[in-house]
Curated annotation (Swiss-Prot):
Gene coding for it: acyP
Name used for this protein in its record: Acylphosphatase
GO terms assigned for molecular function: acylphosphatase activity
UniProt signal peptide: none
Catalytic function, reaction form: an acyl phosphate + H2O = a carboxylate + phosphate + H(+)
InterPro entries tied to this protein: Acylphosphatase, Acylphosphatase-like_dom, Acylphosphatase-like_dom_sf, Acylphosphatase_CS
């Protein structure tokens, strides 16, 4: 399993980016979450079954037509990442 954390910056809050991300993740049957951060970025934690699934998701992170992605910071999470997820959700 591949566990990734992403910090997305740019015009990503107030434009439906979390909903867009949730739809993609649920269509791909991913587990994890997406949430707004106080500094204007969006955080995503996602668990992938295959590297191909991860690459496909990352290609779709360009956002919807209302967002404007400036930067994507990607962090590989340790296999011992302490949280488990049953689905993919928006955290508020």
């Amino acid at each position: 399993m591949y566990k990734q954390q992403y910090f997305i910056s740019g015009k990503v809050q107030g434009v439906g980016f979390r909903f867009f991300t949730e739809q993609i993740a649920n269509n791909m049957k991913l587990k994890g979450f997406v949430k707004n951060l106080n500094d204007g970025r969006v955080e995503i934690v996602a668990f992938f079954n295959t590297k191909e699934q991860m690459k496909k998701f990352e290609k779709l992170l360009n956002g919807n037509k209302y967002s404007n992605i400036k930067n994507i910071e990607k962090i590989v999470l340790d296999e011992n990442y302490p949280f488990q997820f049953n689905d993919f959700k928006i955290y508020y």
